[in-house]
Amino acid sequence: MKRLLIIAHAPSPNIQRMIDAVLKGANSDEIDGVEAIFIPALEANADDVLKADALILGTPENLGYMSGALKDFFDRNYYPCMDKTEAMPCAILIRAGNDGTGTRRALESILTGLRWKIVQEPLICRGDFKEEFIGQAEELGLFMAASLEAGII
């Protein structure tokens, strides 16, 4: 069974709802052969990444940057993953109170260094929280799981 790993920092109930929606989409009844799991950014490690076939990375925008928790994940795991996870398919989910540009740029820079492959346009949910963010997050989870199941990624 293939594994889709969601690594995220969800400090607010709304962001947690978005992560839950990603999991709901990824674990849809339409998908067989893919296990989707969530590990908080402060708990995830290189072994978790090495067991995964694809990743979704989620973060709020904090002062125009990713959360400290997701940055900590990369600080701890960048070099242990560097040469063992080249071309890892991944997607980005950003909950941005502003525009998310700085957060996206920082994540893309790190992912480029790791040589991971962003396989979906980053989902940046901007401005005040809207219920439509939940549906968008669920679609992201479904897309990643279906793509993994089909061998597209």
Question: How would you name each of these model-derived features?
Answer:
Residues N27-E30, N45, K117-I153:
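Glycine-rich phosphate/pyrophosphate-binding loop and the adjoining helix
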Residues A41-I118:
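Helix-loop-strand module that forms the ligand-binding subsite of alpha/beta enzymes
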Residues I7, I39-A41, E121:
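Conserved beta-strand termini and adjacent loop/short-helix elements that scaffold enzyme active sites
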Residues P13-R17, Y65, T101-G102, E132:
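Residues that form or flank phosphate/diphosphate-binding pockets in enzymes
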Residues A26-G33, M82-K84:
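Short helix-capping segments at alpha-helix termini
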Residues K2-N27:
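N-terminal beta1-alpha1 ligand-phosphate binding loop
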Residues A10-P13, I94-D99, I124-K130:
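Short histidine/acidic/glycine/proline-rich micro-motifs that form metal-
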Residues D32-E43:
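A short beta-strand-loop structural module common to alpha/beta enzyme folds
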